[in-house]
Amino acid sequence: MTYVAASSDAIPFPAAHFDVVCSLNSLDHVADLEKTVAEIKRVTRSGGHFLLLTEVNHPPTATEPINLPWSISNTFMDTFRLVDEKRYEIGDHNIHGQILRDARFDESNPANRPGIVLAKFERR
């Protein structure tokens, strides 16, 4: 495996280069969300997959400057087909632990609060 240091808004690979693209607890940390989303779409090949794991609906911070909505998956629907999406409680901010515990988001609780979105997409 070769590691390449690059900005998420200018991925140094040709279009349709990757079979799988992952954004794991990173999308709310990027400098330019629109450019990053465009790059994800650009570098994923047709029939390839995009895996998204992100915190949503939280106040921006210095390290997480972007407040992503619960509807973040819709941002990718013009290019990808949503294969699966799950929502989890934010808990103690241990994203992977919440998924392993299967701590699903309680949709019956009307409180406006942060959470986690885990989604799998297939590129059209």
Model-flagged regions — what are they?
Residues 1-5:
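S-adenosyl-L-methionine
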Residues 6-21:
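A short acidic, Gly/Pro-enriched loop at the edge of an enzyme's catalytic core
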Residues 16, 31-35:
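Short N-terminal helix/helix-N-cap motif within the alpha/beta-hydrolase-1
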Residues 20-31:
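A short SAM/SAH-binding and catalytic strip from SAM-dependent methyltransferases
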Residues 34-49:
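A short glycine-rich, Lys/Arg-flanked "PGG" loop and its adjoining helix->strand segment in the class I
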Residues 49-80:
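Conserved class I S-adenosyl-L-methionine
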Residues 81-92:
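Conserved S-adenosyl-L-methionine
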Residues 93-124:
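Core SAM-dependent methyltransferase catalytic element
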